[in-house]
């Protein structure tokens, strides 16, 4: 059955290329696994204020 073999070849071709592109995207974003950049952006300046009641 050459049609079935060709169909499986097409399916495997797209599976391999999808996996390759997914791996490429994951490896091209090195800061994805480190949340330190996000926490640095969300850092709030905390200062101590002395209230004077008059």
UniProtKB/Swiss-Prot annotation:
Pfam families: ATP-synt_8 (PF00895)
UniProt key word Coiled coil: no
Localization terms from the record: Mitochondrion membrane
Any single GO CC term annotated in Swiss-Prot or TrEMBL for this entry: mitochondrial membrane
InterPro entries linked: ATP8_metazoa
Main location: mitochondrion
Segments traversing the membrane: 9-29
One MF term in the entry's GO annotations: proton transmembrane transporter activity
Annotated GO biological process: proton motive force-driven ATP synthesis
The keyword Secreted appears for this protein: no
Membrane topology: Single-pass membrane protein
Keywords: ATP synthesis, CF(0), Hydrogen ion transport, Ion transport, Membrane, Mitochondrion, Transmembrane, Transmembrane helix, Transport
Family: Belongs to the ATPase protein 8 family.
Job description of the protein: Mitochondrial membrane ATP synthase (F(1)F(0) ATP synthase or Complex V) produces ATP from ADP in the presence of a proton gradient across the membrane which is generated by electron transport complexes of the respiratory chain. F-type ATPases consist of two structural domains, F(1) - containing the extramembraneous catalytic core and F(0) - containing the membrane proton channel, linked together by a central stalk and a peripheral stalk. During catalysis, ATP synthesis in the catalytic domain of F(1) is coupled via a rotary mechanism of the central stalk subunits to proton translocation.
Assembly: F-type ATPases have 2 components, CF(1) - the catalytic core - and CF(0) - the membrane proton channel.
Protein name: ATP synthase protein 8
Higher taxonomy: Eukaryota, Metazoa, Echinodermata, Eleutherozoa, Echinozoa
């Amino acid at each position: 059955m050459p049609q079935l073999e060709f169909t499986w070849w097409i399916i495997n071709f797209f599976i391999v290329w999808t996996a390759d592109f997914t791996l490429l995207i994951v490896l091209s974003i090195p800061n994805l696994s480190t949340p330190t950049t996000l926490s640095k952006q969300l850092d709030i300046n905390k200062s101590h204020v002395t209230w004077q009641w008059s």
